[in-house]
Amino acid sequence: MQKARIRLSGISPKDLDGVCNQVKSIAERTGVNISGPVPLPTKKLVVPTRKSPSGDGTATWDHWEMRVHKRLIDIAADERALRQLMRIQVPKDINIEIVLEG
């Protein structure tokens, strides 16, 4: 039987866990096997910027950071489960990647 690997990523861990819970509830309702969600390492993106607007004065820096959280879910590729997965309401800052593996 085919497997669907679902990779979720986003900057809000609260929204990410909400989508993971929706996927788990779909798997329980349809009765398919599920493994996960597996938390993957968080990627930290750091952008240093100068504090002074003109460039004069001492070189003081601000460091802005964005964290990208990721989750991985493997689910049996049942047709009913995949149709319901396509209808999940997903927040704008969450990215979903679904790959079918044989």
Curated annotation (Swiss-Prot):
Q: Which domain of life is it from?
A: Archaea
Task: Give GO MF terms, alphabetically.
Answer: structural constituent of ribosome; tRNA binding
The answer to whether UniProt assigns keyword Ribonucleoprotein to this entry is: yes
List, alphabetically, the Pfam families matched.
Ribosomal_S10
Protein keywords: Ribonucleoprotein, Ribosomal protein
InterPro entries xref list: Ribosomal_uS10, Ribosomal_uS10_CS, Ribosomal_uS10_dom, Ribosomal_uS10_dom_sf, Ribosomal_uS10_euk/arc
Which GO biological process entries does UniProt record here? translation
Task: Reply yes or no: does the keyword Electron transport apply.
Answer: no
Spell out the GO cellular component terms annotated for this protein, sorted alphabetically and separated by semicolons. cytosolic small ribosomal subunit
UniProt family annotation: Belongs to the universal ribosomal protein uS10 family.
Record's HAMAP family?
Ribosomal_uS10
The record describes its quaternary structure and partners as:
Part of the 30S ribosomal subunit.
**What's the stated role of this polypeptide?**
Involved in the binding of tRNA to the ribosomes.
Protein name in UniProt: Small ribosomal subunit protein uS10
